[in-house]
Every structure is written in structure tokens, then in C-alpha cells.
Curated annotation (Swiss-Prot):
Residues 2-61 form the LCN-type CS-alpha/beta domain. This is Alpha-toxin CsE5. Has the structural arrangement of an alpha-helix connected to antiparallel beta-sheets by disulfide bonds (CS-alpha/beta). One of its GO terms (cellular component) is extracellular region. The lineage of its organism: Eukaryota, Metazoa, Ecdysozoa, Arthropoda, Chelicerata. Keywords: Disulfide bond, Ion channel impairing toxin, Neurotoxin, Secreted, Toxin, Voltage-gated sodium channel impairing toxin. CDD domains: neurotoxins_LC_scorpion. It comes from Centruroides sculpturatus. Belongs to the long (4 C-C) scorpion toxin superfamily. Sodium channel inhibitor family. Alpha subfamily. The keyword Secreted applies. Disulfide bonds join 12-60, 16-36, 22-43, 26-45.
Length: 63
């Protein structure tokens, strides 16, 4: 398992305002839990499966 910022198919993080939104998003991706990291206004997940995509150094390419 790993921790990190979940990303969509374009390697873009999920913006957020509420922890509930991120927790649900992370649970859908089979993580243990998640929250909205205010410093980056992005969802952060704990305990994601190793094969779940997370933010890397690549650029965000919105669909």
C-alpha cells in the first residue's frame, strides 16, 4: 500500500474543499482513508493499493 495524491487519467490531482469528498474519493479507490489537504487544496489518500495512480512529477493534462 502507499499514500499519495490520487489523480485522474490526465495525471491531475482532485481539488477539494471538504474532507468528506476526499474520503469518499479515496475509499472508492480502495484506500484506507483520505482528507482534503488545505495547503495544496487537493485530496490526499492513505493506504492506496500500489497499482492506484498517484501524482508524480509529470504535468497535469486536463481531458
Amino acid at each position: 500500500k502507499k499514500d499519495g495524491y490520487p489523480v485522474d487519467s490526465g495525471n491531475c490531482k482532485y481539488e477539494c474543499l471538504k474532507d468528506d469528498y476526499c474520503n469518499d474519493l479515496c475509499l472508492e479507490r480502495k484506500a484506507d482513508k483520505g482528507y482534503c489537504y488545505w495547503g495544496k487544496v487537493s485530496c490526499y489518500c492513505y493506504g492506496l493499493p500500489d497499482n492506484s495512480p498517484t501524482k508524480t512529477s509529470g504535468k497535469c493534462n486536463p481531458a
